[in-house]
Amino acid sequence: MSKTIDYEKIPGHWLLASLGKTVLRPGGLNLTKKMLDQLNITKDDHVVEFAPGLGVTARLTLQHDPHYTAIEQNEDAANKVRSYLTGSRQQCHIGTAEKTGLPDNSATIVYGEAMLTMQSAKQKQQIIAEAKRILKPGGKYAIHEMCLAPENIDNALKESIQKDLSVAIRVNARPLTIAEWKQVLEEEGFIVTEVKTAPMHLLRPKRMIQDEGLPGVIKIASKVICNPKARKRVLKMRAQFTKYEQYIQGVTMVAQLPEK
């Protein structure tokens, strides 16, 4: 596999996945679980997940046996998702978070993680608008993203963080403050009901053990040690996360549409 990966250009999340990391969300598995707890998913829900990827959150959701629809961008990604889906109540469609192809008012819960942070302001709005379109009145939309702190963070510092993170992870990173995240949701008619944060410790040993377990961390570490090019990229990412750790966090928000 290492022969086919350009370690200099591959997006950071796929680099980490190639090394065996399964939890790639900014607030870690614990914050994901808090998000799901607030959603209170039951077998009567119709759940839509944008870009489930490796499926860590999807598997937690499926424990509650809801109607479940994943949205993935291409057939290769969709087939990976379908490998852990079972039964007629679980499916994966080809589409994007901006254009799912799903009917209006067809879901009771929609969520996406580590997605909006990487989008422009216009794309953020389009994705949130699509979540609104496919949700039934009273439906819930949850996000798990990266946020900036404090609320009055200096604009020059914000730009430096966005630039340095984008260079390190090879994907445009446009995190917002908590107030800004709430604003983009409220502009589409959502009412934010829950906000929870966690430190952005994605590559810290303690968080990695919490997320991956000790055997998983040992396996990841051995791959990093044996792959100089991958190690160089991982260390660059970790250096930027550490440099700005007092200004970046993981955040999850649950927002609800009004009942009609």
Residue ranges and their predicted role:
Residues E194-K260:
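Conserved Class I S-adenosyl-L-methionine
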Residues K43-G53, A142-D164:
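Conserved class I S-adenosyl-L-methionine
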Residues A173-E188:
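Short alpha-helix
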Residues Q125-K140:
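A short glycine-rich, Lys/Arg-flanked "PGG" loop and its adjoining helix->strand segment in the class I
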Residues E98-V110:
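A short acidic, Gly/Pro-enriched loop at the edge of an enzyme's catalytic core
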Residues R25-K43:
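Conserved alpha-helix/loop element of class I SAM-dependent methyltransferases that forms part
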Residues P52-K99:
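Class I SAM-dependent methyltransferase SAM/SAH-binding core
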